[in-house]
From Swiss-Prot:
Name the UniProt record assigns to this protein: Uncharacterized protein RP551
Any GO BP annotation: tRNA threonylcarbamoyladenosine modification
Disulfide pattern: none
Domain of life, source organism: Bacteria
InterPro entries associated with the record: ATPase_NBD, Gcp-like_dom, T6A_TsaB
Amino acid sequence: MPMIEDIMKLAKFSYDDLDYLAVTNGPGSFTGIRIGLASAKGILCAKKNIKAVVVSNFEYAYFRAITQVKNYDKIYVFLNAYRLQLYMQVFHKSGKREEPLLIDYDYAIKRLTKEQGSIVCCGSGLECIYHNIMYLSHIITLPRFARVKAWVICRYITTMLSRDIKLNNSIAPLYIRQPDAKRTID
């Protein structure tokens, strides 16, 4: 919290100046996601004038992709899940979103090989399968966006608001794989 306070002072803002508080909910580091969400909950409890906006790391990568590529049929977002696995979510040009999945590298490669149309691939997990898909002519690969940038999230939220699209305000982590502690107990 001291870091947040320092940034607010530096920007000459108070919490009363804020309309929205945006936070990412994952998937990602279990501890990092939990700390971010807990901090957001604390601020939102203290300041009722602020509205919560939750953006997944999939949505973040998807938004970065559509700002770079306009002609596509589907966008595949791959996030590194480690242990030779990826988190994957597919966004269709029509607006349909498939449910996020935990997959292995082979599944991703086979699925992309069978795809037709113009397919965009992006996300931190793309590097794990890149050498296996780089020669597929229907695949457009975008560089991974190593860090989530606050300004991109703000731009995404502004875009959503301008289109009257309902924003996610559920301050809850996006779990696709159970936390290690849970798997150990089971």
